[in-house]
Amino acid sequence: MVKLDRAARGLFLAELVRGLSLTFSYMFRPRATINYPYERSPMSPRFRGEHALRRYPNGEERCIACKLCEAVCPALAITIEAEPREDGSRRTTRYDIDMTKCIYCGLCQEACPVDAIVEGPNLEFAAETREELFYNKEKLLANGDRWEALIAANIAADAPYR
């Protein structure tokens, strides 16, 4: 009886028919994928993309040169140099991030006491040369200026969980 059952299954190719029916059932369902460059999926406010340095509304940069982000970076991708100003506060003279080393862990953003360094919503920052991935202070401030509205909205949305 067992041999007859096995022969009947082999003759009628039950597994093949079951697999084909599953394939055909998926063929008529709505697509689960999106057409990326033309359609965008929603992004979480916690998305960690391209780095940016933020400014206060009066235009002054937020970074107070505490160097916590440099100390906490596991990839050693951040380099900061600072000088005291006339009023006694410190400000950065050099703020570099080597994006080839960065692992996008977000520890720099968590360590910053004034929300100066953030990982913004930009995920499309490909470069043609390696040198373009070495971000200096001017590039980071320009990123912050470009994405400030969205960065502020993301930080506000994430505020209850911080």
Curated annotation (Swiss-Prot):
Its EC number is 7.1.1.-. InterPro entries: 4Fe4S_Fe-S-bd, 4Fe4S_Fe_S_CS, NADH_quinone_OxRdtase_chainI. It is found in: Cell inner membrane. It is an enzyme of class 7 (translocase). GO terms for biological process: aerobic respiration. Residues 53-83, 93-122 form the 4Fe-4S ferredoxin-type domain. It catalyses: a quinone + NADH + 5 H(+)(in) = a quinol + NAD(+) + 4 H(+)(out). GO terms for cellular component: plasma membrane. Its cofactor is [4Fe-4S] cluster. Binds 2 [4Fe-4S] clusters per subunit. [4Fe-4S] cluster 1 binds at C63, C66, C69, C112. [4Fe-4S] cluster 2 binds at C73, C102, C105, C108. GO terms for molecular function: 4 iron, 4 sulfur cluster binding; iron ion binding; NADH:ubiquinone reductase (non-electrogenic) activity; quinone binding. Keywords: 4Fe-4S, Cell inner membrane, Cell membrane, Iron, Iron-sulfur, Membrane, Metal-binding, NAD, Quinone, Repeat, Translocase, Ubiquinone. Belongs to the complex I 23 kDa subunit family. NDH-1 shuttles electrons from NADH, via FMN and iron-sulfur (Fe-S) centers, to quinones in the respiratory chain. The immediate electron acceptor for the enzyme in this species is believed to be ubiquinone. Couples the redox reaction to proton translocation (for every two electrons transferred, four hydrogen ions are translocated across the cytoplasmic membrane), and thus conserves the redox energy in a proton gradient. This is NADH-quinone oxidoreductase subunit I. It comes from Rhodospirillum centenum (strain ATCC 51521 / SW).
